Amino acid sequence: MLKRIRAIFQIILLVIISIATSVCQTNNKTTALWLFDEQIGFYPSHVLEDFSDNNIPLVLGLGGQIVEGKFGNSLDPINQERISLPKGEEEFGLKKMSIPAGRTIEPLSWHNAKFAAFMTSGENHLRKEIGFRKPTTTKLNLGDFDWTVDFWFYPYRKTFEEGVLFEIGTGPRGENNYITSISLEHDLTNFKLVNYASDNIIRLQTNLSMNEWQHVAFVYDSRSNSLSHFINGKKLSTVQNIRLKELDIGDEDYMSIGRDCKWQKQFQGKIDELRFTEGMLYNSNFIPSQSLSPYTNITQKDSLIKGPILLAENRNNTFDIGSRKHLFIDNLLIEKSENIKFVVNPPRKGEVVISDIEGQFRKHLTVVEDEKGKIRIYNSAEKDYLEVFISDDGINFTRPNLGNQIKGNNNYCILEPVGGLGNPFIDPNSEGEGKWKYITGYHSRGTYLYTSPDGFVWKRMKLALIPFRNGTQSCTFYDDQRQLYVSYHRTGIHHTPGLATERASVVTQTNNLLSPIIYKPLSQSEYINIDKKERIRDPLPWWLDNGPLTPGDWGKEFPVKFKPDVEDPIGTDLYITKAIKYPWAPDTYLAFPIVYFHYYNDGPITRHELENPKRERGSGPIETQIAVSRNGLDWNRFYRPAYVGIGKHENYDMKTAYIAQGMIKRGNEIWQYYFGEPHYHSAHLKYDDKRAVFRLIQRIDGFISIDSPYSTEAIIITKPLLFKGNRLMINIDTEATGYAQIGFLDTNNNPIRGFEIDNCVYINGDFIETEVEWIRTSDGNSNYEHDNYENLEAFNNIITSSDVSSLEGKEVKIIFRMKGSKLYAMQFKNKLD
């Protein structure tokens, strides 16, 4: 019996041991995971993302390319296409620098940035804004603790010297041998680990096959002081009795992937999914896992919500408007008109809703109605973290307690430097963890997607949606009529005639926000050709603009859809687009561009004088205008009156007016909000205690109207239409002494019996929605004599009708006759008598 128990125990023990031998303890922690899944053609200076929780980014250099990989893409330490470098500033790496006294290595610039992938806390003469980590303070600094380094490798070239997989050093770069590195000898027979701190140089025999993907792993066991090497899960070699040591923390520490610190010793092939782990992942043979790309439980509906076909895409002479509401923001449906004008209707300025602003407070606000009908205002404040205010009535806003306290306030929902560079919105195509979305800049390293189940707790997708850095708020909306997510992002690639930055916006479109948006890389020669036709700022190519350690700004890779035009004063910027799809009528896209009038560079000296510090102004004032579109891409901007101008408001004398992204519907009103300051952009004299957020009140559908003059009648005849419904409803304001009449015509412009414009009951008054009526005699005859009624009894012979069902589905035109009136919108509806 005892022997049987002992045998069973031995079997159990063997099972436990066998389970433990292939994959080690479960408390392993990923230090860094670079998937290198950025797009092929990825520009140098742009960020290679770390998919661990430690946020350790790299940047791509002139000595590396993103190419096809084992899983997605990979890093190949081969040179980028050669470019001719323009002259420029030291900060942006365009000036070749002399070797400093006491050193031997030329400081980093575009002239020598031949690294493949790199991070550094040195090279501080350059612009560095992406949040590099100090590698010697992390577990990338391999030493006397359990660790694993593994990756997929595709060797396809042999070299005359060893090739470096990675090198980490205390710095200054290239000035000493204080490094830890793993390299592959030139004949591909041995890997070599160099650990300066422990004075170890360790060779591990390998067995690589050329032109094949292989999984490579190195595992250090600090208990046995051994280092093992695996190929495709098979242990090939182990070195015993070594004691590694971490490097000292360096003031100018760095890490280079694919080359050494002098950008030499090119690794012999492609690297995919490079991972550093604190802990031993393997201690015996194993089967390599598939891709390490993290699984996400954020999903998008298989079929995107689809709205009606855009009227603007109509290819026939007849427009089938069905029962959709039509806002008169342009002449899309107009065939002929006389004496009309499209007019901007600025909102009524309401009360202050957020005041007593202290400290940092970004101008770029977003207003959203949440699932419970509460109104939220998002913006960034301290440290560029995102905060939120909440209101039941849209007037009294409070700070919700989200448990993230910064300087006494608990309403912060993203504790990362996002700068308010996006607009949180509810995605109609997602539920659960991805219901809320926020596309924003992050750490000046690119444009990223954040997701949230409730708009309070957010998570950033690791891979940038687009790798270009944001300088201000990106504006995103879902277009149900084109089934695309549309985003506008500011670019500064153009310059004014006076060589100042001319700000405009590019547009991106995608049907899947969970995957990066791919762009077509532009070569230097392509940029030079563009520069012959447009005023393009130096340097060319544009991705050089921030230096080799900070990503480039938005360039010509995406179409520019919002920019200053010939009507604007010279030296005017379109700072932010603020584009939306109007939620309460199809075919209607509105933008509220923030327009910035520069005092400097352009125009005469009499204009430049306004920036004189003695005047205590600044670089210029800012207003909000309005633009309209029928497809969200092609815009018509109205210059005057300004939609939200500068001037007096609630005892504030505002010099800048930044409207918030988004709007709220309450009854027959649209509420918008804006941030105002009583000082100028780049102010010489600031009044930070007088900054405030205000409510704006707009008539529903009332942004633009067709106005008719007071002195004479105006006429509008539409193009041929098909409609669905039995009533024609009009949003109109005639004031007291204006009026309108409406009739129907056939396609030959003949009046349709019973719906003649002369028989239309005068529309007189202010109506959000009023039925159009026609009069007839009691015998049904509409051909009565007008102006023939001298007493009230005559009206007994008159009946009115608003029923247009007899015209439903027939090709008709609508004729409007107006005087002293504003026409906003129309809609056919079905209504029971």
Language model segments and positions:
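Short, solvent-exposed beta-strand-to-loop segments that form ligand-recognition rims
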Residues: I231-D253
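Beta-rich carbohydrate-recognition and catalytic domains
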Residues: N297-I576, K581-M654, Y673-D833
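Glycan-recognition/cleft segments
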Residues: G163-L193
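Localized edge beta-strand/strand-to-loop motifs within extracellular or lumenal beta-rich domains
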Residues: E212-L227, K819
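Aromatic-rich beta-strand patches that line glycan-recognition/binding surfaces
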Residues: H46-S52, D150, F160-E175, I257, ...
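Short, aromatic/His-centered strand-loop micro-motif at the edge of beta-sheets
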Residues: F191-H215
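Extracellular glycan-interaction patches encoded by glycine-rich segments
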Residues: G122-N124, I249-E273, M280-L281, F286-I287
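Extracytoplasmic low-complexity segments
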Residues: V23-R127, Q240, S284-A312, E338
